[in-house]
């Protein structure tokens, strides 16, 4: 109780979509209860500034492009649902408990220490092992990839702005570039100097 930070940055959560079908209890415990517990502690200690991680998963299969913060929320899985609920919880705690926050909807974060179940890491591994990479729709699906260093820089900038901010605001954190997955695979081939084996 003697430690009174001016800002809490919460990036903790159980990530991933597929695992949410296997262990939904973990997503409810960490993503919902964990977030609620954090806000309760902040309320008790009179801490009023929060930056927290949300996700582009709140949009599901977006029907508007480019997707902006006012786009319809259509989560397709429990992971996305927990992020939508977190945003609602943050809004309630701002209104009734004076906790002002920025929610950051990250779009496919990547980096050198990225999760092994993510597209880039999985593709690199399969190219090296000469395993088949399944590409649907001839690899024409697109994603927006955001490097972790860009994410850190954005969080740093927002950490300076939140000091004088009152309210609850959501931000899409992305590169604003739609990358086709077949283009991604070709780029990885060039970097690795190896050919991939793809299947449509």
Question: Could you say what each language-model-derived stretch is?
Answer:
Residues 6, 18, 25, 36, ...:
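Residues in well-ordered alpha-helical elements
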Residues 38, 93, 122-127, 154-158:
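A short, amphipathic alpha-helix embedded in the catalytic core of nucleotide-handling enzymes
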Residues 127-200:
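C-terminal substrate-binding subdomain of Rossmann-fold SDR/epimerase-dehydratase oxidoreductases
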């Amino acid at each position: 109780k003697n430690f009174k930070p001016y800002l809490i940055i919460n990036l903790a959560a159980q990530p991933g979509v597929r695992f949410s079908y296997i262990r939904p209890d973990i997503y409810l415990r960490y993503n919902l209860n964990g977030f609620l517990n954090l806000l309760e502690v902040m309320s008790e200690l009179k801490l009023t500034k929060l930056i927290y991680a949300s996700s582009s998963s709140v949009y599901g299969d977006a029907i508007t492009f480019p997707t902006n913060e006012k786009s319809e929320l259509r989560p397709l899985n429990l992971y996305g649902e927990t992020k939508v609920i977190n945003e609602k919880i943050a809004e309630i705690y701002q209104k009734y408990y004076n906790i002002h926050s920025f929610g950051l909807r990250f779009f496919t974060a990547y980096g050198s220490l990225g999760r092994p179940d993510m597209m880039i890491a999985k593709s690199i591994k399969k190219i090296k092992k000469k395993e088949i990479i399944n590409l649907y729709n001839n690899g024409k699906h697109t994603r927006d990839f955001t490097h972790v260093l860009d994410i850190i820089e954005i969080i740093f900038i927002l950490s300076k702005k939140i000091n004088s901010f009152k309210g609850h605001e959501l931000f899409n954190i992305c590169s604003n570039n739609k990358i086709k997955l077949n283009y991604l695979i070709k780029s990885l081939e060039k970097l690795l100097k190896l050919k991939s084996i793809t299947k449509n």
